[in-house]
Amino acid sequence: MNVSFSTPVQNSTASRLALIQQAAARSGALPPAGQYRGSKLSPFDVSQMSGVSISMVERAKINGPEFVEELEWLRQQTTSRCFLDAEMWTNEILAHLPDKWCAPNTLNLYNQVSELVLDNTRSPMASPASNSLYAPGEDQMPTVKRNHTSRFAQSLIKNKEFRRAAFFLEKTMNGNKLDHFLHFRCLFLAYYQEHLENDAEGIERKTSFAEERSPFSLLYQRMEDKKLRENEDVWFEYLMGLLEVELGLKDLAEKSFRNVVIREPRIWPAWEALSRLIADIEDADKFVTSAEVKSLWMGDWFMTLVLQRFHQHSMAIQKAEQLVTRGMTGLPMIITKIAACSNARHDHDQAISNFEDVRKADPYRLGDLHLLSDSLYIRNDQKKLSTLAIEVYKVHKFRWETCCIVANYHAIRRDSEHAIKFFQRALRLNPGLAALWVLIGHEFMEMKNNAAACVSYRRAIEIDPADHRGWYGLGQMYDIMKMPAYALFYYQEAQKCKPHDSRLLVALGDIYSKLNRIEDAEKCFTGAYLFGDVEGNALWSLAKLHERYSDDNKAAQAFEVFLVVYELVTSAEEKIIYAIAFLANHFFKIEDFDKASEYATKCLAFETLCQEGNRLFREIAKIQARESRLPVEEAPGPSNASAAGGQEAMDTEEAPQEGGEEEMSEGEDDFSF
């Protein structure tokens, strides 16, 4: 039977046991979550399971000197243009270079080629005659004073005094190409900062411009009038792409960032911005592999971010590990990304292990560390979480990651009021993060404040409709409130965002079963198992569904596969005990005494089932003894007639004893079938 893995559920004429067994075989080929390194799972298998197709071509080892040259160029560009985040990102990679790439001749390679020149911008579109430092026909400020003013403006940018910096750069912009760019960038940063400050208290509350146009719109029009998109400095087009994002012109912004990457593939901020806008994974892969893009390694890292954004975390891990295989070993950036993807896949042990490796190399690094607190919270490791919260609170008290970690610490102690307080503080520091609203919603649910939880989840959906967690939170809330029709809608929306998440399919199946839509529920539970049952609930829910509607044969089939998969999992002991008891009694009822004896034997391995197992053995022995006497009773002869009366009397005497044993066994355990 051929099975399509591009959709979570399907109709099939084959038996349900065959479908489940095929799912077990398919899932059995997968390694444990987060353990792809050294496994036999091919990129094609991962692609088939995820429903998307990208190129996983084996690429050659990264050339160390070329890698360093790219980063040195980017470091100089981001430093001179005051892109502080990109500068720190670049310097972190350079600081963790593999030892073999740190030879003196390698590190000095680029510095021997050129020194930093303020107006130098490498671009294939630049003309040799266009590198004049001064704009034609403009008055020139004395060189010394201009240099001092430029340096002062750059200091103001680093101090986040953007309007003040723009004021001073306006004096020097006509005599210096770099200051020309920085002036427009400072205006953008000033408007962006004011926008965030206005929206800090209420995300998505739009500022009203009743009498004047948006400052972003005015700045964009000014740059269009000056034809800065065609400027030899490619960074102008990148800046216009950022303006287009703020104006809601997402298609134009995507086109701008694509052009920037084609013109200068070493500008990582353009790759990063494009990863947040590109429409789908296949389109991103086609762009990266096109002949126009000449990238040594940034294209692969870009694909890792795109795959993570579209919730293809297994494939993102593989892409990241490809970079490690190609030589980028020991980089906290890559290890942290693998940890973040493991967290999203609910492989929290792997995530914790990876984060701990990063903290050994860089103890004060906060990037994505809130996800470590999330994994510790889910693992209920209060000791490690409290230690982490104390350490980061001492050093980085006013970072949003710290606020999330401290909030999770209060949450694990069931102090929801303090948890909400710190989550709200994190929102003020990073107002555009939908995940924070989701976490606040969870805490309101703990406090049984459904109205506030509903508002929080809806805020998360407004900020990022593609994030399944806001939809899933609303579905859970309505499910708890016994409103399954509402819950169904939000679970369906969540499943659209992340169609291969087994948790969402199990939740959908539960709602369908509550609405008596049995076939839909069965498809969801089966589909959840097909896509790798993360929490181990799909087969169990499928078996209980059939048991609830008295379809014991199908329930037994599901319980059998459940035991094959989970019998050795200690955390599922209660479910294992129930499944064994059900199967032992089921096969006894249908008189399959061989299988009944097999499961009765398994009953003896559990203290709570010993008496049930012994009772079944006695019942089976009596039935088999009775059946063995039947041929003797039916044989012709005078002795049989005389023995019939005596045998009948013996059966009459034994009957109360059997009934007594049944009465004794009744109530010996908590299982009822």
UniProtKB/Swiss-Prot annotation:
UniProtKB keywords: Cell cycle, Cell division, Developmental protein, Meiosis, Mitosis, Neurotransmitter transport, Repeat, TPR repeat, Transport, Ubl conjugation pathway
An MF annotation (GO) of this entry: molecular adaptor activity
Pathway named in the protein's UniProt entry: Protein modification; protein ubiquitination
Outcome after substituting residue 161 to K: In ax68; results in sterility
Residue ranges, compositional bias (Acidic residues): 650-673
UniProt-listed GO biological process terms: anaphase-promoting complex-dependent catabolic process; asymmetric cell division; cell division; meiotic cell cycle; neurotransmitter transport; polarity specification of anterior/posterior axis; positive regulation of metaphase/anaphase transition of meiosis I; positive regulation of mitotic metaphase/anaphase transition
Bias (Low complexity): 635-646
Domain of life of the organism encoding this protein: Eukaryota
Disruption phenotype: Developmental defects in the gonad, germline, male tail and hermaphrodite vulva. Increased number of germ cells arrested at the metaphase stage of mitosis during the larval stage L4; by adulthood, there are no nuclei in the distal part of the gonad and as a result, no sperm or oocytes are formed. RNAi-mediated knockdown results in defective metaphase to anaphase transition (Mat phenotype) and embryos that arrest at the one-cell stage that display defects in the formation of the anterior-posterior axis.
TPR repeat positions: 86-120, 159-195, 232-267, 332-365, 400-433, 434-467, 469-501, 502-535, 539-572, 577-610
A single Gene Ontology CC term: anaphase-promoting complex
Outcome when changing residue 70 to K: In or192; results in sterility
Record region (Disordered): 628-673
PANTHER family, sorted: CELL DIVISION CYCLE 16,23,27 (PTHR12558), CELL DIVISION CYCLE PROTEIN 23 HOMOLOG (PTHR12558:SF10)
Functional description taken from the UniProt entry: Probable component of the anaphase promoting complex/cyclosome (APC/C), a cell cycle-regulated E3 ubiquitin ligase that controls progression through mitosis and the G1 phase of the cell cycle. The APC/C complex acts by mediating ubiquitination and subsequent degradation of target proteins. Developmental role in early embryogenesis and the metaphase to anaphase transition in oocyte and spermatocyte meiosis and mitosis in germ cells. Required for embryonic anterior-posterior axis formation.
Family in the record: Belongs to the APC8/CDC23 family.
Record's subunit section: The APC/C complex is probably composed of at least 12 subunits: apc-2, apc-10, apc-11, cdc-26, emb-1, emb-27, emb-30, mat-1, mat-2, mat-3, such-1 and gfi-3.
Protein name as catalogued: Cell division cycle protein 23 homolog
Organism of origin: Caenorhabditis elegans
Gene expressing this chain: mat-3
